[in-house]
From Swiss-Prot:
Pfam families: EFG_C, EFG_III, EFG_IV, GTP_EFTU, GTP_EFTU_D2. It comes from Colwellia psychrerythraea (strain 34H / ATCC BAA-681). The keyword Transcription regulation does not apply. GO terms for biological process: ribosome disassembly. NCBIfam families: EF-G, PRK12740.1-5, small_GTP. Residues 8-290 form the tr-type G domain. Keywords: Cytoplasm, Elongation factor, GTP-binding, Nucleotide-binding, Protein biosynthesis. This is Elongation factor G 2. Catalyzes the GTP-dependent ribosomal translocation step during translation elongation. During this step, the ribosome changes from the pre-translocational (PRE) to the post-translocational (POST) state as the newly formed A-site-bound peptidyl-tRNA and P-site-bound deacylated tRNA move to the P and E sites, respectively. Catalyzes the coordinated movement of the two tRNA molecules, the mRNA and conformational changes in the ribosome. GO terms for cellular component: cytoplasm.
Length: 699
């Protein structure tokens, strides 16, 4: 089957923003104007098409990235039909994983900002992710009808706070209640949208007289930026002082694709003004799959050489699975982006990450949560497959004869953990299945069982993240859970060296028990664990009983002497003892060794150890004092500070795990969400006396 839309007319874009910038409303308008939805859905009514989870409709925020496909011919019908694959992404900091994996497979993005609140902390996070994947982007300053809206102030913020070379292609006519439309700086005309038909029709008018000078000034800026694209344009601009509309667009497109400029437009999605102009900008200035760098991967050969897949239907098939979702009707949906080649329903492909073949049972095009079955997908397409068994987020799918492993996505380590247990014993198995499915969908969500407490511990990116997953277990899987606080896994060790006697003698007629040992106990090297040394000479303890002595000591390592936590890093030397010809046996020596070990551990200056986490906080310089002060209050040891991306600072510290609960929320409120952090286990350190005292009292 031939391709319906040429790949040059594809646009794979994400709509990204901070919470409440109006990005879902913007997407709803896009669906309305491109003819996909006949009635506009409003977020505040809980009726938005893209927010399809019950919780999203209740909370008015977007949790998962919904993918949809639409077609656009331009505001004036000036283009041939272009296919736009859109992914709507969440703006809440707990769901940055969704933004990260969307940007990995997109070619361009529209960043939506609020006209009154401008660049928000979460915008900085999203911006860093866009920079990481070098995604060409344009900005839509939304909510120009809001109190305090100021388009040029937001443009200035883009320059100062994000270091962006922001170039307006529109100017706002009026603001707040007086917002009427926009000035198109390329055409030098005012655009007014018709309120009576929800902005479906519009008219070009003369620029208001009081804005003429300002418009000319900003147009001059626009032309000079476009002229920087190449020598030919620059020469013409220097000679004639102007460029044609077409030349301006060519220059702006080249510089946008090179990530040298960020084009800015404005409007009010809620008032149906400006969204069609953004769609035109997507087509005119954002790349098709053939205009972005070809994807690279590792070939399946001895040298693991670099392989390249260009956006071509004739090339071998390659795709990246970027999201797994559970659908109540069809089971597992695997969202994937095709980078090269063609795949049809029923075809088998290879997953080099898992080393398994997979078969495409059904392929569907998604419109929010509505599915439309299709027979094939080609280079540049984004679709979902039903029936893939062992694919997880970030896996490559490719032609079995031309194996390539595309670069895997990086996912942040979870930063907050809680213990969960089902409300009824009968739900234990159901909870296990539910957690398994949720973990398969979301790589930033982890499930583990604590070996010591037996608790199921779930970990994620923040409290809201875990709240929503617990709520989903209840709604989608019918499992109600009690959520507790996780227990910190402390340890114990000894600091001194002692020689101790262990004696177990029971001789009162009949067969008795006799075991007698002398042990030397001392601290072992950090991380060396338990070490047993046999220095018996002359057979004072018979050879056959020595393994029992070691076993008796080893078993005592599992329960410490201060608070019952496992002991770490102890060296035990068996150097003397005695035995009885009749009454000595393995059990007697094992018990004698246990008693001696316990007595020795109590005498050898035992201490409690607490897990220390390596914490790395990325923060704007302005918040660094607050961040460092807070880490010090948490008994953290600052290891150093480095330069971070976009003028931020990175603070490295070693902090006790017990002090890190609630840190995600505290850091967010202290820095208005502008800082982010990662945390991993580093080592065990001796707990201060007061802390150790509290731990012993609570056991």
């Amino acid at each position: 089957m031939a391709r319906i839309t040429p790949i040059e007319r594809y646009r794979n874009i994400g709509i990204c923003a901070h919470v409440d910038a109006g990005k879902t409303t913007t997407t709803e308008r896009v669906l309305f104007y491109t003819g996909l939805s006949h009635k506009i859905g409003e977020v505040h009514d809980g009726a938005a098409t893209m927010d399809w989870m019950e919780q999203e409709q209740e909370r008015g925020i977007t949790i998962t990235s919904a993918a949809t496909t639409c077609f656009w011919k331009g505001m004036e019908g000036q283009f041939e039909d272009h296919r736009i694959n859109i992914i709507d992404t969440p703006g809440h900091v707990d769901f940055t994983i969704e933004v990260e994996r969307s940007l990995r497979v997109l070619d361009g993005a529209v960043l939506v900002l609020c006209g009154s609140s401008g660049v928000q902390p979460q915008t900085e996070t999203v911006w860093r992710q866009m920079e990481k994947y070098a995604v060409p982007r344009i900005v839509f300053v939304n909510k120009m009808d809001r109190t305090g809206a100021d388009f040029l102030y937001v443009v200035e913020q883009l320059k100062t706070r994000l270091g962006a070379n922001a170039v307006p292609i529109h100017l706002a006519i009026g603001a707040e209640d007086d917002f009427e439309g926009v000035v198109d700086l390329i055409k030098m005309k005012a655009i007014n949208w018709n309120a009576s038909d929800q902005g479906m029709t519009f008219s070009y008018e003369e620029i208001p007289a009081d804005m003429q000078d300002m418009a000319e000034e900003w147009r001059e800026n626009l032309i000079s930026e476009a002229a920087e694209a190449n020598e030919e344009l620059m020469d013409k601009y220097l000679e004639e002082g102007d460029l044609t509309e077409e030349e301006i667009k060519v220059g702006l497109r080249a510089r946008t694709l090179a990530n040298e400029i960020i084009l800015c437009s404005c409007g009010s999605a809620f008032k149906n003004k400006g969204v069609q102009a953004v769609l035109d900008a997507v087509i005119e200035y954002l790349p098709s799959p053939t205009e972005v760098a070809a994807i690279t991967g590792i070939n399946d050969d001895k040298d693991e050489s670099e392989g390249i897949r260009s956006a071509d239907d004739e090339a071998p098939f390659s795709a990246l699975a970027f999201k797994i979702a559970t659908d109540p009707f069809v089971g597992t949906l695997t969202f994937f982006r095709v980078y090269s080649g063609v795949v049809q329903t029923g075809d088998s492909v290879y997953n080099p990450v898992k080393g398994k073949k997979e078969r495409f049972g059904r392929i569907v095009q998604m419109h929010a949560n509505d599915r439309q079955e299709i027979k094939e997908v080609r280079a540049g397409d984004i679709a979902a497959a039903i029936g893939l068994k062992d694919v997880t987020t970030g896996d490559t799918l490719c032609d079995a004869k031309h194996i390539i492993t595309l670069e895997r996505m990086e996912f942040p380590e979870p930063v907050i953990s809680v213990a969960v247990e089902p409300r009824t014993l009968a739900a234990q198995e159901k909870m296990g299945i539910a957690l398994g499915k949720l973990a398969a969908e979301d790589p930033s969500f982890r499930v583990a069982t604590d070996d010591e407490t037996g608790q199921t511990i779930i970990s994620g990116m923040g409290e809201l993240h875990l709240d929503i997953l617990v709520e989903r277990m209840k709604r989608e899987f019918g499992v109600e859970c009690n959520v507790g606080n996780p227990q910190v896994s402390y340890r114990e060790t000894i600091r001194g060296t002692v020689e101790v006697e262990g004696k177990f003698i029971r001789q009162s007629g009949g067969k008795g028990q006799f075991g007698h040992v002398w042990l030397k106990m001392e601290p072992n090297e950090e991380g060396a664990g338990f070490e047993f040394v046999n220095e018996i000479v002359g057979g004072t303890v018979p050879k056959e009983f020595i393994p029992a002595v070691e076993k008796g000591c080893k078993e005592q390592m599992d329960s410490g002497v201060l608070a019952g936590y496992p002991l770490l890093d102890i060296k035990v030397t068996l150097y003397d003892g005695s035995f009885h010809d009749v009454d000595s046996n393995e059990i007697a020596f094992k018990v004698a060794a246990s008693m001696g070990f316990r007595k020795g551990a109590l005498e050898a200056n035992p201490v409690i150890l607490e897990p220390m986490m390596k914490v790395e906080v990325t923060t704007p310089e302005a918040n660094m004092g607050d961040v460092v002060g807070d880490l010090n209050r948490r008994r953290g040891m600052i290891d150093g500070m480095d330069e971070g991306p976009a003028g931020s600072k990175i603070v490295n510290a070693l902090v006790p795990l017990a002090e890190m609960f609630g840190y995600a929320t505290d850091l967010r409120s202290a820095t208005q969400g502008r800082a982010s952090y990662s945390m991993e286990f580093q080592q065990y350190n001796e707990a201060p006396k007061l802390v150790a005292q509290k731990i012993m009292e609570t056991r």
